Amino acid sequence: MGYSSSSRIGLCLFLFFTFALLSSARISLSFSENEMTVVPERSLMVSTNDYSDPTANGRHDPPRGGRGRRR
């Protein structure tokens, strides 16, 4: 056949990456806040809501009066 070496390499790379993409397509990476994902071998509970609502820092007390702190 009249295929060049570069077209064979390109075809091999295309097939390799297509196979890699299709074989990993069953793995879902997008999760809602709390979602249970079941894979035939194992199950995994994912929680992306790790932090509470933002509040002011109760321990922060800025210096009073003047331009800055005295040492």
From Swiss-Prot:
Region (Disordered): 47-71
Residues bearing PTM Sulfotyrosine: 51
GO molecular function: growth factor activity
Broad class of the protein's primary localization: secreted
Any one of the GO CC terms: extracellular region
Subcellular location: Secreted
Domain of life, source organism: Eukaryota
Chain positions found as 4-hydroxyproline: 63
Transmembrane segments: none
Residue stretch(es) of the prosequence: 26-49, 66-71
Glycosylation: residue positions: 63
Post-translational modification remark: The sulfation and the glycosylation are required for full activity.
Keywords carried by this UniProt record: Glycoprotein, Growth factor, Hydroxylation, Secreted, Signal, Sulfation
Signal peptide: 1-25
Family the entry assigns: Belongs to the sulfated-peptide plant hormone family.
UniProt cross-references to PANTHER family, sorted A to Z: PROTEIN PSY1 (PTHR37177), PROTEIN PSY3 (PTHR37177:SF3)
Function: Promotes cellular proliferation and expansion.
Name listed for the protein in its UniProt record: Protein PSY3
